[in-house]
A protein has these predicted regions:
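Catalytic domains that recognize anionic headgroups
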Residues: 1-163
Length: 163
C-alpha cells in the first residue's frame, strides 16, 4: 500500500481505473484511489467500535507527480512537502474536547509537518508529559506556532513554502 514508486505495485489490478495520456500519473492516481478505499474501510471499522475516539492520518512525504520527479531529494521541489493530513473523531470525542476541535478548525490552513506528530498525538490522547510536551508543536494547542520560517526540510536546509 502507499504511493511510492513503482506505483503499479501498490494497488490491486482491479484498481487500474484511471486512463489518460499520462500512464505515470494514472498509476499514481490509482494508488490514491486504492489508498482512499483502504482508509475508508479502516475508518468504518474503527467508527463502528464503541470505544472509538479518534483517527489521525498523515503521509510521510508528498510527490511531484506533475513534474515526474517521484520523491527524490536531489530534485527537491516544495510540492514534495505537501502531505495529506486529516483527523476523524467520534461524537463523544467532539463533545468532550471542544477547545481542541475549535483550535483545529481555526488552523485548517496552517502549516504542519509530520515531525510534529508526537506533541499532537499526546494531546489527542490526553497524555500529559510536561517534561516532553512542546505546545508550540501541537496543532491542537492554543500555543501552536505556525511561523513560516520554522518549517524546513532536507535536514533544515530548505524552507517549506506555502502552496
Amino acid at each position: 500500500m502507499g504511493s511510492h514508486m513503482p506505483y503499479a505495485y501498490h494497488h490491486p489490478k482491479s484498481y487500474e481505473k484511471i486512463h489518460s495520456d499520462d500512464p505515470y500519473r494514472d498509476q499514481y492516481d490509482d494508488t490514491i484511489l486504492f489508498h482512499d478505499y483502504v482508509m475508508e474501510k479502516l475508518y468504518e471499522t474503527l467508527a463502528a467500535r464503541p470505544d472509538f475516539q479518534t483517527l489521525l492520518y498523515f503521509s510521510d512525504h508528498g510527490e511531484a507527480i506533475d513534474l515526474h520527479l517521484d520523491h527524490n531529494p536531489a530534485t527537491y521541489v516544495p510540492a514534495m512537502t505537501y502531505i495529506p493530513f486529516y483527523m476523524a473523531f467520534s461524537d463523544t470525542y467532539l463533545s468532550s474536547h471542544p477547545k481542541l476541535i475549535e483550535n483545529l478548525a481555526a488552523r485548517q490552513k496552517s502549516r504542519w509537518t509530520n515531525d510534529l506528530v508526537f506533541d499532537t498525538q499526546l494531546a489527542l490522547m490526553g497524555i500529559r508529559l510536561p517534561d516532553l510536551y512542546e505546545p508550540e508543536n501541537d496543532i491542537t494547542s492554543d500555543h501552536y506556532d505556525d511561523t513560516p520560517d520554522r518549517f524546513k526540510t532536507l535536514f533544515g536546509t530548505r524552507a517549506i513554502t506555502a502552496k
